[in-house]
């Protein structure tokens, strides 16, 4: 059986580990989110891809769900002594080695997909891990800021989540997505899958940002395979965690799930999921305050398919309303 999963970080990685235990003979391809990617201290960091890699490769810090087990922080301590920031995102020494290799290879001209394949070779992953795109696409969040022009400004999702602890969001911005295309192998993995799985990753900033890459949403909609979403049940999940400057972890509230039965593509009323949060894909230079409303990302499917989408209960996306499932 060929299984293709669209996955974010912690939730997706843990689901994949269970999937492999349940279906050890399956050929699994994972299409990973790159929206969390960023450059810090000159290093290209891919949090979600690395979390999947470390988890399935046996190197993850199990208690946190991210970062390396038995990590040390000598470099971070030295940077702090020099007064070099930012101090809200701590990189471990082992983790830095991964980022050094990635940055060096990308600087030499290798695309992210080739770099990811090379990094995964070391970990002997039981899956094929693909970035959703080789292009640089980052998720930014528009927040209120009385001191900014127009009263709003956009920050990188990692800063929004880790440093600012997820204040009310006004828009989700996929910066650079207009010029992006699926990484090699992504569309083929979707078209050739026997099952397409949406793990319990955040539907807005993990699954949604993958579907935002031009061509991926339509490929999922056109795929002959069933599309199955797996979500947490309200009150049973401990929520997701985020790193802090003091290396402790902050846990978000429990999650809830919404089950949606998808109608035929040619029905008079397909199904989609909307939310009271603007979503926009535009360049970084556009005015953040002019972000236009758009529907949240979700795949269109055929009759008889059931999708249970995971909805995190953090501020901006905890009031999603199930209506229909049409992009």
Model-found features: residue ranges?
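A short, Lys/Arg-enriched amphipathic alpha-helix followed by its capping loop at the start of a domain
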Residues: 15-26
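Electropositive, gly/pro-rich neighborhoods at or near active sites that engage anionic ligands
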Residues: 33-174
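A short helix->loop->beta-strand "cap" motif at the edges of active sites that frequently abuts
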Residues: 24-26, 223-227
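Short glycine/serine/threonine-rich phosphate/pyrophosphate-binding segments
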Residues: 11-16, 205-210
């Amino acid at each position: 059986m060929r299984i293709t999963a669209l996955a974010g970080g912690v939730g997706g990685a843990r689901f994949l580990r269970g999937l492999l235990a349940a279906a050890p003979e399956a050929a699994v391809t994972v299409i990973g989110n790159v929206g969390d990617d960023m450059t810090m201290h000159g290093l290209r960091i891919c949090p979600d891809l690395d979390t999947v890699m470390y988890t399935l490769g046996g190197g993850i810090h199990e208690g946190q769900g991210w970062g390396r087990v038995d990590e040390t922080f000598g470099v971070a301590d030295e940077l702090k002594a020099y007064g070099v920031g930012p101090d809200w995102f701590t990189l471990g020494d082992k983790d830095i080695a991964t980022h050094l290799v990635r940055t060096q290879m990308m600087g030499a001209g290798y695309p992210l997909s080739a770099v990811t394949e090379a990094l995964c070779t070391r970990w002997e992953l039981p899956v094929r891990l693909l970035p959703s795109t080789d292009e640089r696409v980052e998720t930014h969040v528009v927040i209120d800021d009385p001191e900014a022009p127009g009263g709003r400004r956009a920050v990188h999702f990692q800063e929004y989540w880790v440093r600012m602890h997820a204040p009310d969001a006004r828009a989700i911005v996929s910066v650079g997505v207009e010029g992006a295309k699926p990484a090699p192998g992504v569309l083929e993995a979707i078209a050739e899958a026997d099952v397409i799985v949406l793990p319990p990753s955040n539907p807005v900033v993990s699954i949604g940002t993958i579907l935002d890459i031009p061509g991926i949403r339509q490929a999922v909609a056109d795929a002959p395979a069933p599309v199955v979403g797996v979500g947490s049940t309200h009150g049973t999940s401990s929520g997701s965690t985020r790193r802090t400057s003091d290396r402790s972890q902050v846990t978000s509230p429990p999650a809830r799930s919404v089950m949606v039965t998808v109608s035929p593509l040619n029905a008079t009323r397909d199904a989609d999921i909307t939310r009271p949060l603007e979503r926009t894909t535009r360049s970084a230079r556009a005015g953040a305050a002019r972000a236009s409303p758009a529907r949240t990302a979700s795949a269109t499917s055929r009759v008889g398919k059931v999708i249970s989408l995971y909805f995190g209960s953090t501020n901006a996306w905890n009031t999603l309303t199930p209506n229909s499932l049409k992009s």
